Amino acid sequence: MNAEPHGHPGEALLRSDRQPHIWCPECGIGTALSCFTEALVRSKLDLDKVAVVSGIGCTGRVAGYVHLDSFHTTHGRAIPFATGLKLANPLLKVVVFSGDGDLISIGGNHFIHAARRNVDLTVICVNNFNYAMTGGQVAPTTPLGAVSPTTPYGTFENSFSLPALAASCGAVYVARWTTLHVRQLIRSMETALAKRGFAFVEVISPCPTLYTRRNKLGSGLDWMRMLRDKTDVKNGADPRTVDIDFGGRITIGTFVDIEKPTLQDKIDESMKAALGEAYTRIDQAGTDRSERRALLDQ
C-alpha cells in the first residue's frame, strides 16, 4: 500500500519559487515562519484579508516568502507602515513579522507608541540577540556580558526585556516562546491572531553563524538542548521578572492576556461623539469606489 504524501501544513502559504532562502543552517527563523503558517491555517482567517509587514534584517525576509499580501518596508518602519494599513482598512488582519533589531532598536519608538495606542496588530518578533544580517553587532537585546564584534570584551549595556517593554506600554497580549517549543508557539500565534489590539509574541531563536559561535554556545543542536534544559514555563508571570541573563535560565509562557478598546474603537467613539449619525467608517461604506471617495472628500 502506498503511503499518502505529507506536505508542510502551511505549504500553500509558502513561496517555493523564492527558494533557496537566505537563512543559515540551524537558524530558527524558518521554524518561526513554519509555526506562523500553521497558526494561520488553524485560525481560519480569510487569507485574502491578511497582510504581512516586515522590516529589514534576516527576519525581514519573511514577507517575501509567503503567499499573502506582504510588504517589505524600510528599516524600523514595519509598525508605522502596518498601522497605516490597518487604519486605511480596518477589515484587514495585519501582522508585523520582523526581528529584534528592526522592531526594538531602529523601530523602538514606533513599537512603544503602537502598544500605547493599542493598534490592532499582531507583532511577532524573532529575537536572536544581535544584528545578524550586518555581522552580529551588539543590539538592545544582547544580554549583559555577551560577546559581539562591537563588544569584543563583553556587552556592558543592560538589555531590553521585550515582554516587560510590551506590557508596560499597554499590549493586550504578551508571550514568549522559543523555536524549540513549536506546539506552544503555534498556539500562542493563533491566540495572538485572534486578539483585538496590540498582540506581541517574542520568539527566542538561535543565530548559529554569529551569536552562538562567537559566544561559544555550540551547535544548533546544543542550542536546542540549552532551550530544553534552561527554560521555565511560567504562564501568568509578571513581565517585569522575565529578563534574560547571559547563560541564565529563560522564562517562557503567556504573561499578559487582557481585553481593552483598540485605537480604532477610540477613533470611532470620538468621531461619533463629534459627528453623530454623519460618521461612517470607511470600511462600512460599501465597495463602490465613488461612495468611498465621497467619504474621503468630506
Mark where each language-model region is.
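Active-site-proximal loop->helix
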Residues: 108-113, 133-145, 165
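Flexible, low-complexity linker and terminal segments
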Residues: 1-9, 17-19, 206-298
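Thiamine diphosphate
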Residues: 54-132
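Short, hinge-like loop/turn segments at secondary-structure boundaries
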Residues: 69-70, 114, 139-143, 192, ...
